[in-house]
């Protein structure tokens, strides 16, 4: 008898047994308690059997027990000592482990995201650097090619300038010929002046009229020899005053600049290096195609209007333009 009483007293000292005893006194079933508390029947059964569900936190379990106690009219002060013996042990073991695992999982996820972010950032920086290097290298190669072409053309221009004096010596021959032609004219005119002198000396001579005729005939061809010289000033004036073209292209240079200009026929109007302070006035058949090594060093006027080169100056690139009378300058 004493053993059975001791067992009943121990069972009554547990939280689950105390709640079951109070429920049975009120005549409630586990299903009714579960419906009123909005819990599962299995959860109510675990509470009465003093079992803690593995998927249920200790905080929620304490809340369910308190709600159950209020339902069966058991004071919380009576259940607190019993809950203190059961819940703290489980809370001390489970709660820290759960928070540690969550923190470890979150830290692992954050570390993976951070690694991926750094990888993407490095890839973007690498691609940007490679693109900039290729563009810079291409510009340097193009500028060096232009410089080589310019130096080659300058060397060719120097060779041609050395041959110019040989060509200018040719007009000296016509000058000598003209001097030779003028000599007979002078000699022919000499008898005309001497003829009047001989006439008074030989007044009675019959030959005097015939000599006068001969001298007159000698003076007659002398006039055509001098007449072709008169048109020369007129031809020289025509050469020095050429007619201005409506398609003039004017360029002023504020620094050394490599330049290449060609017209619609493909003829190169200019190709070479222009020095600081120089200017060019070109005319040809539109449209013009321009290639400028240093756009910031040149100012262009086409048909009296300035050409905008600001987009090439900002990017510091070689300017390639097509100038047309009907359209605005295009790259």
UniProtKB/Swiss-Prot annotation:
Physiological role: Cytoskeletal protein that is involved in cell-shape control through regulation of the length of the long axis.
PROSITE patterns referenced in this protein's UniProt entry, alphabetically: HTH_CROC1
Family label: Belongs to the RodZ family.
Annotated protein name in UniProt: Cytoskeleton protein RodZ
Annotated InterPro entries: Bact_Cytoskel_RodZ, Cro/C1-type_HTH, Lambda_DNA-bd_dom_sf, RodZ, RodZ-like_C
Annotated ranges, domain HTH cro/C1-type: 19-71
DNA-binding region: 30-49
Residues in compartment: Periplasmic: 133-331
GO BP annotations listed: regulation of cell shape
Cytoplasmic compartment segments: 1-111
Low complexity: compositionally biased ranges: 167-202, 216-234
Composition bias, Polar residues: 146-166
One Pfam family matching this protein: HTH_25
UniProt keyword terms in alphabetical order: Cell inner membrane, Cell membrane, Cell shape, DNA-binding, Membrane, Signal-anchor, Transmembrane, Transmembrane helix
């Amino acid at each position: 008898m004493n053993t059975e009483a001791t067992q009943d007293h121990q069972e009554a000292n547990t939280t689950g047994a105390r709640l079951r005893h109070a429920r049975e006194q009120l005549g409630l079933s586990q299903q009714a308690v579960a419906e009123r508390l909005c819990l599962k029947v299995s959860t109510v059964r675990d509470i009465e059997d003093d079992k803690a569900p593995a998927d249920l936190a200790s905080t929620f379990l304490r809340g369910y027990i308190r709600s159950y106690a209020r339902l069966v009219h058991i004071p919380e002060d009576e259940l607190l000592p019993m809950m203190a013996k059961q819940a703290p042990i489980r809370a001390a073991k489970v709660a820290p482990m759960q928070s540690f695992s969550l923190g470890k999982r979150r830290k692992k996820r954050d570390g993976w995201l951070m690694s991926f972010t750094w990888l993407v950032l490095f890839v973007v920086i690498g691609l940007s650097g490679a693109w900039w290097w290729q563009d810079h290298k291409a510009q340097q190669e193009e500028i060096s090619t232009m410089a080589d072409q310019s130096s080659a053309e300058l060397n060719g221009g120097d060779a041609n300038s050395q041959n110019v004096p040989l060509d200018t010596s040719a007009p000296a021959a016509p000058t000598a010929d003209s001097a030779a032609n003028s000599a007979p004219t002078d000699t022919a005119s000499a008898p005309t002046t001497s003829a009047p002198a001989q006439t008074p000396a030989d007044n009675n001579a019959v030959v005097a009229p015939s000599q006068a005729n001969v001298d007159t005939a000698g003076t007659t061809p002398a006039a055509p020899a001098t007449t072709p010289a008169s048109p020369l000033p007129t031809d020289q004036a025509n050469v020095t005053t050429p007619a201005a073209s409506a398609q003039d292209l004017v360029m002023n240079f504020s620094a050394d600049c490599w330049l290449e200009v060609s017209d619609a026929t493909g003829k190169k109007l200019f190709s070479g290096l222009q020095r600081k302070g120089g200017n060019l006035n070109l005319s040809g058949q539109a449209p013009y195609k321009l290639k400028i090594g240093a756009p910031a060093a040149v100012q262009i006027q086409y048909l009296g209007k300035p050409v905008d080169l600001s987009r090439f100056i900002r990017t510091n690139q070689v300017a390639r333009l097509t100038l047309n009378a009907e359209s605005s300058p295009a790259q």
